[in-house]
Amino acid sequence: MNYHGLVKRLDLPAGWMAPAELEYDDIRARAISRADNDDDVRGINASIELIRRTRGGSWPTGPVSTDFNYVDEVWHECEFREGDSFTYAVYDSRGHYLGCCYLYPVGRRTPLTEELLEYDVDVSWWVTPGAYERGYYTKLYVALRHWIESAFPFMKAHYSNAEIPELPG
């Protein structure tokens, strides 16, 4: 079957609400909102090449403006509220911006294929260069795995980043 352009919607229990805040070790994630715009714009614009290398894909195509990103964050807020996808701004426990993580329907970010049908969420993330140097890329991956298992109703997550960290045995 040709799945080109199809998206497998998130299958959420009736009445289930995604957590607005998540914590793991010294990582704090909160549902992204317009209040995160300045941090997010600075983070994206400082991280373009790192995002492309680690998360993969073609976004961002270049620096983002405050106005453009504001519209994007309003869209993420609406998607979160409707349960269509979940985007989080990520900070450390001291309030320093680290990056973002995304829980999307399979097929939105990565083209849907027969092999991907078994997954019920597409998980991706990125961190700023400073956060990457301090090991937060791997730490956020560990946190995401924990949150998917403990805070979300997903049975099988597809971690779609181009660079997937190796976890200690």
What is the meaning of each model-derived region?
Residues M1-G130, A143-G169:
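GNAT-family acyltransferases
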Residues A131-K139:
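Glycine-centered recognition micro-motifs in short, flexible terminal segments and loops
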